[in-house]
């Protein structure tokens, strides 16, 4: 019952593309129902990346696997990466990504908040970004190959990183439809706020994700245009990453955890405050 087939991993170059076409042609003939995933190489931009994408378009790959293990400044500059991607041709599989800081290639809360902010562009552009996957899932504290990773363990204990909770908050609150969202600031993100919004048809709730990458607490006023009234209480889930270098460890696995609290609604809006370096998620029901 295979649905997807990735051909290669971080391959690039003239000979790779010449040989790849024979695999694609054979798979299309034998199993046209299987989604073929090609590669844009190991880079997130540049000549090899552009050549890889051009080859994937020419050969008709369904998805292109992009990888980016990058520092904070790259993520800061890439919050709108997919807004201007072509809407025709192959779609995107963000197959490996993680944020790290200068000299800090381990998990820490400061990197997690930029991953959360970057994921707003993945969610807003769900028409072009069809799948995502974080960096490696498991790592043993005494025998790891690279960092960061989502879950760390030793022979007896396990710790979920702050990056794990970022992924969990998105995965459990995807929604069924992307909702247009306007932030009345120019330029957007200048104050460190990034956001995305979806509608969950099954739960009949709006899901608004707001990430504050600045160090200052900021006011948040969410208005749902065209909605007469909301349920009296919305549910907020927050992940406080303000202790920049901190993370969960096998010795202290519950240092940073998502926290839930109710928020009073008023008409078709909620007004609250988001702390510095915080990922906040609001589930807002219709009345």
Task: Give the label of every model feature segment.
Residues 177-212, 218:
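Surface beta-strand/loop "capping" patches
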Residues 43, 135-140, 183-188:
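A glycine-rich phosphate-binding loop feature that marks nucleotide/adenosyl-phosphate handling sites
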Residues 1-16, 94:
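Active-site groove signature of glycoside hydrolases
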Residues 24-28, 32-35, 53-58, 62-173, ...:
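Catalytic-core region of carbohydrate-active enzymes that cleave or remodel glycosidic bonds
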Residues 11-17, 41-48, 68-78:
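Acidic-and-aromatic substrate-binding clefts and catalytic sites of carbohydrate-active enzymes
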Residues 185-186, 211-287:
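C-terminal beta-sandwich/jelly-roll accessory domains of carbohydrate-active enzymes
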Residues 18-19, 44-48, 110-116, 189:
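Short, glycine/acidic-rich beta->alpha junctions
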Residues 39-59:
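Catalytic core of soluble alpha/beta enzymes
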């Amino acid at each position: 019952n295979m649905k997807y087939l990735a051909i290669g991993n971080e391959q690039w170059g003239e000979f790779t593309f010449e040989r790849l076409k024979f695999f694609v042609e054979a798979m299309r003939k034998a199993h046209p129902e299987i989604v073929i995933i090609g590669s844009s190489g190991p880079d997130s931009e540049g000549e090899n990346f552009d050549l890889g994408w051009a080859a994937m378009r020419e050969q008709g790959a369904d998805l292109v696997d992009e990888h980016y293990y990058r520092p904070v400044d790259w993520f800061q500059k890439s919050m709108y990466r997919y807004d201007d991607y072509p809407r025709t041709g192959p779609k995107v599989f963000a197959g490996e990504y993680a944020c790290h800081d200068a000299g800090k290639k381990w998990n820490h809360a400061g990197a997690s908040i930029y991953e959360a902010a970057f994921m707003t562009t993945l969610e807003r552009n769900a028409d072009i970004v069809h799948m995502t996957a974080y960096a490696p899932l498991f790592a043993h504290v005494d025998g790891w190959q690279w960092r960061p990773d989502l879950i760390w363990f030793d022979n007896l204990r396990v710790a979920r990183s702050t990056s794990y909770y970022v992924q969990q908050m998105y995965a459990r609150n995807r929604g069924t439809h992307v909702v247009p969202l306007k932030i009345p600031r120019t330029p957007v993100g200048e104050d460190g706020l990034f956001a995305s919004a979806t509608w969950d048809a099954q739960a009949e709730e709006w899901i608004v994700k707001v990430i504050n990458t600045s160090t200052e607490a900021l006011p948040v006023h969410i208005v749902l245009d065209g909605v007469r009234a909301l349920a009296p209480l919305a549910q907020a889930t927050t992940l406080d990453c303000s202790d920049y270098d901190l993370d969960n460890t096998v010795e202290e696995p519950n240092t940073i955890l998502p926290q839930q609290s109710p928020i009073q609604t008023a008409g078709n809006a909620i007004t609250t405050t988001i702390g510095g370096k915080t990922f906040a998620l609001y589930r807002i029901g219709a009345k």
